[in-house]
């Protein structure tokens, strides 16, 4: 991070992003590509899980907002 002030003007001029110190290393996939597409049921379950994970805590906070304001 000490070299960042010297490198930043150089990066802006060339429009290059410095992502890591060791170039050439890339992420390898941990498992092979899926052979069949996801079914409608699998997608529906995934969407329900994602939305409930975000909406349940926010619904709790909004329903008890008056208690949070008092504290």
Swiss-Prot record:
Q: Name one GO cellular component term.
A: mitochondrial inner membrane
Keyword Lipid metabolism belongs to the record: no
Q: What membrane topology does this protein have?
A: Single-pass membrane protein
Task: Using the UniProt entry, state which stretch of residues is the transit peptide.
Answer: 1-28
Tell me the keywords, alphabetical order.
Membrane, Mitochondrion, Mitochondrion inner membrane, Transit peptide, Transmembrane, Transmembrane helix
- GO biological process: what's one of them? mitochondrial electron transport, cytochrome c to oxygen
Topological domain, Mitochondrial matrix: which ranges? 29-39
Q: Which family does it belong to?
A: Belongs to the cytochrome c oxidase VIII family.
Q: Its quaternary structure?
A: Component of the cytochrome c oxidase (complex IV, CIV), a multisubunit enzyme composed of 14 subunits. The complex is composed of a catalytic core of 3 subunits MT-CO1, MT-CO2 and MT-CO3, encoded in the mitochondrial DNA, and 11 supernumerary subunits COX4I, COX5A, COX5B, COX6A, COX6B, COX6C, COX7A, COX7B, COX7C, COX8 and NDUFA4, which are encoded in the nuclear genome.
Q: What is this protein called?
A: Cytochrome c oxidase subunit 8C, mitochondrial
- Origin organism of this chain? Eulemur fulvus fulvus
């Amino acid at each position: 991070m000490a070299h960042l002030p010297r490198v930043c003007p150089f990066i802006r001029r060339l429009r290059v992003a410095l992502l890591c110190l060791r170039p050439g290393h890339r992420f390898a996939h941990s498992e092979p590509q899926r052979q069949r597409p996801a079914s409608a049921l699998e997608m529906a379950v995934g969407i329900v899980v994602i939305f409930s994970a975000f909406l349940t805590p926010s619904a709790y906070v909004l329903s008890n907002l008056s208690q949070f304001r008092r504290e």
